[in-house]
Amino acid sequence: SRRQRQMCIRDRNAEFLVAVPTDITDVEKRAFFELFYKSKFRPKNVMLCEKPLADAVGLGIDVNQPTGVMVVDMGADTIEISVISLGGLVLSDLMHFGSNRLDESIISYIRREFNLVIGKKTAKALKEELGSGLPGRQETMTVVGLDVVSGLPVEREITAEVVYEAIKANLESICSSIKLILEKTPPELARDIIYAGIYITGGGSKIKDLDQLFTQITNIKVNTCENPEESAVRGLSKIATDSKYKRIPFSMKNTTLK
C-alpha cells in the first residue's frame, strides 16, 4: 500500500531508502527489500527505515536524543502510535485501520440512518469538511446519493453532528490505544512526553479538533504540523543526507540474497 512504499531515492541506480511499518515480520521486511532491490531501477542497495522514526525526523525532532517522544501517525490504512528515544522505538502499536475506515463508517451510518447510499468520494468529502474529534460543530453539507427505497438520486443535507456520530467509535478506539501506550511508557520518558506534548501526523490528523480530543483524554498538549501527510518523506530525505542519522536505516541484503 502507499503508506508502505514511501521512499526517498539518493541517486538512480544507487541506493533506495524505504519507510516500513514497525509491526511487520522479518519475512515481510525481506519482501519489501526484494521488491525494490529487484525492481527496474536495480539499486546497489535498499535501506529500510521504521516509519515512526521517519515521521519524527520529518517533524523536526532529533530522535537520537535520550528524551522520550510520542508520535501518532494517522495514515490511510493504518494508525501507528509510537514512543521513540535514543534513535529507536521503545513502544509501538500498529492499528490495522486508518482514515479510510472513517470513510467506510460514514457510508454505513448514512445508509443506516437515512436510507441513503453515498460513494467513497462523498464520504471522504464529508470527513474532510465536517469531520471532528469533538461534538457540537454546526456546519452542514449537501450531498447527492441514491435513495435505498426508490433507487433514485436524491439530495440531502448532512450535519457535522451526523459525521461525528459516524466516526465516534473509531476515534474512541484510537484514544484507547494512545492511553494504553502511555500507561506502558517508562516514567522517565512519560515525563518528557508530558513536557513536549504528543505529536500527530499523517493525513488523518487533519480532522478538526482531533488535537483537542487527544488532549482531553490524556491531559497532555498535542502538536500538529503543516502537510502532515508528507512528514515521512521529509524525514527520509533528512535521514538520507544527514550523517547523524546514519545508524537508523538498516539493510537486509546479506540476509536476503543467496
Protein language model features and the residues they cover:
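Short acidic, Gly/Ser-rich segments with clustered Asp/Glu that frequently serve as metal-coordination loops
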Residues: 76-78
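A structural feature that tracks compact, well-ordered secondary-structure segments
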Residues: 80-82
